[in-house]
A protein has these predicted regions:
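Extracellular beta-strand-rich solenoid/capping regions of secreted or surface-exposed proteins
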Residues: 1-13, 22-43, 58-70, 94, ...
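Short glycine/acidic-rich loop motifs that flank beta-strands on beta-rich extracellular proteins
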Residues: 2-3, 23-27, 34, 55-61, ...
Length: 308
């Protein structure tokens, strides 16, 4: 295991390095034995690393250090052409960070202790004073040209929380582009401003799920979402609201959604708690076609095509 406690503004490089954990040598279930752990610091570049078979995460970014009016978030971290494979809890976790870029990385074969995601962006629970300072956040995270495959949980999990007392989200600005989810999917909630563009999502269950905590400003654009199970009862994209969680400005556009036995898109909204747009999508072989009158008046629905 490598722990990085780096301070200052100079650049720190780690490259062409392999870490093999002892997951196969122990039956003990654990979550904290990480291959690489970045607790502090900024301007860090990880390049061409492999971190696998760890009894925690392949890469962990975050800390629990709190101090009034000082931000101790790890920041400006670039992870380039790295492979996180066969780890026990996650391929990679981010619990606190600002400006993290993943480029050309692989998150594969995570299996052991839930959530078992390829990449999990999930702030830890902290006391209310820390929420008010907004310094315990996950913000400005970019995922480009990455590959997620055969993880026991989600390919990508973005698990935010309720707004703080100032009405702000602590998960903000998540961007996913040109990435492939092979036998994987995306679960995202409790956040503001997430964009997923030009991605292929091949799943054996649902493709996308938003629920649990209120979510704002989500764009799913130019994505191919396909269920690989021939006979199934799944939904391609599901957004679910209750009296306690409403979702605003959810936009699904220019996507092709294929072979979901129940719905291509299902907005489970009995309280008019979802607003957004569903436009210019193509549905292939989906069990039930969504009609405009199935949706709340806050949803713009037009120019979608159904090919049965």
């Amino acid at each position: 295991m490598i722990y990085l406690y780096l301070f200052g503004t100079c650049f720190h490089f780690i490259y062409v390095f392999m870490i093999i954990g002892n997951k196969l040598e122990s039956d003990i279930k654990t979550e904290q034995c990480h291959g690489i752990c970045i607790r502090y610091g900024s301007n860090i570049i990880l390049s061409n690393l492999q971190s696998g078979f760890n009894r925690g995460d392949g890469l962990y970014i975050g800390n629990v250090y709190l101090e009034s009016n000082i931000d101790h978030s790890p920041s400006y971290i670039s992870v380039i052409n790295c492979i996180f494979s066969d780890n026990h809890r996650q391929g990679s976790s981010i619990t606190r960070a600002n400006h993290v870029d993943f480029l050309g990385c692989k998150f594969i074969n995570t299996n052991g202790t839930p959530p078992q995601a390829g990449l999990d962006i999930e702030p830890n629970d902290i006391n209310i004073s820390a929420y008010e300072n907004c310094y315990y956040a996950c913000e400005n995270i970019r995922i480009n040209n990455c590959f997620f495959s055969n993880n026991a949980g989600n390919g990508l999990l973005v698990a935010g929380r309720s707004k703080n007392r100032e009405g702000k989200y602590i998960v903000n600005n998540i961007f996913v582009n040109n990435s492939v989810f092979d036998r994987g999917n995306i679960r995202a909630f409790g956040l503001k401003n997430m964009q997923v563009k030009d991605c292929d999502i091949l799943t054996d269950s649902y493709g996308w799920l938003t629920y649990r905590y209120s979510t704002e400003d989500v764009l799913i654009d130019k994505c191919k979402i396909i269920c690989c199970n021939k006979n199934n009862d799944f939904v391609g994209i599901k957004v679910e609201s209750t009296s306690e969680n409403k979702h605003n400005n959810i936009i699904i556009s220019n996507c092709s959604i294929t072979n979901f036995g129940k719905f291509g898109i299902f907005f489970n909204d009995k309280i008019d708690g979802i607003s957004g747009r569903i436009v210019n999508n193509i549905f292939h072989k989906c069990g039930k076609n969504m009609k405009k009158n199935d949706l709340s008046k806050k949803i713009e629905y037009k120019e979608n095509i159904y090919n049965d």
